[in-house]
Amino acid sequence: MKSRKILAILLIIALMIPFTMILGACQAKSSVIKIAMLPKFKGENYFDAAKNGAEEAIAELNKEKKVAEFLYDGPPQDQATNQKQVDILEGWIAQKVNVIIVSPNDPTAIAETLKKAQKNGIKVLTYDADAQTDARDLFVNQVVSAGVAQGLLEGAAKILKEKGYGPDATANIACVSSAKTDANQQAWLSEIRNLLKTPEYSWMVIKDENSDVYYPGPDETTTQTQCGTLISRMGAGDDKIQAAIGLTSMATPALGSQFQSASVKPDINEIAITGLATPNAIKAYIKDDTNPLKTGVLWNVMDLGYLAVQCGYQMATGSITSSSASVNAGRLGERKIVDKMVVLGPALVFDKSDIDKYNY
């Protein structure tokens, strides 16, 4: 009788062991934080660089053991719409990811889907471009808008002054943006307009908002076409444009390219080109003495992706919240959190003298 009891106990233990192993495996699996990153579109060097930084952060988090899993998807450039982003987000919500990091194409239209993710317990962060503040938990901002505008106008003003423009010689400027719904470009344009009213930059003028601010959207072909049109309008004289400023990482290289390929080029001694771009995208133009693109403005894009993942992981694990005072962002050190926003750092202005220092 006693031996039967012992046998029964051993049988129960034997049956429990596989169950315990399965349960432990499930618990281990559930402890892995799934972080999903959604750019405005895929296949462009700016967002590719941010992805590289994000993957670096994931590798760093998984150094001792696997604690984070990285998912990455986005619409192609020629389909960079809110609906395409929403379709991807819906899939991630169904997969029950822990963190979504998104650069919205339309900050208002995407809000409903982001709120749905939040209701499902997903931490929502924006990077590069913001959404409505009530539709995300944290905005990982690359640089404050005023800093971007300052860097762009400083770069343009420096080149123009070398060509004889200044307080006594007005220069007409034009900007190439993206879509009118893009929150970043609208914020930067607003700051540029404000700075143009100050004594330091009052000699630089956007004469006509309708004709001198271009909105090609995210399509590369349209961007190239409109940049070509702008290049054809540049030159000396009050009826011409003296400075072209690219407000996207697609527009600025397009301006350099369109000048280079123009059959009839404006006088390089009368014009200036600058704008936002990754250094590698405009390095050839900046180093070319026959091209008027002489300065670029950006931030460390890889660090932006890295910072976004660090913040997302710590929000998912409860190490920080939207109301925390700061975040310890790995190799980037401590970054302050103010009004549900963390800022990477100041704008980076580069030219021929230092562009080789940057490889992205």
Task: Show which residues each predicted segment covers.
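Short, low-complexity disordered leader/linker segments with a strong preference
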Residues: 1-34, 93-94, 115-120, 356-357
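Extracytoplasmic "Venus flytrap"
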Residues: 34-61, 71-86, 103-107, 179-186, ...
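Short beta-strand elements in bilobed, periplasmic/extracellular small-molecule ligand-binding domains
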Residues: 60-78, 197-220
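Hydrophobic alpha-helical segments within soluble ligand-binding/sensing domains
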Residues: 85, 140-171, 187, 220-227, ...
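Hydrophobic alpha-helical
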Residues: 94, 99-119, 192, 212-285
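Hinge/cleft segment of the Venus flytrap/periplasmic-binding protein
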Residues: 169-184, 300-301, 305-360
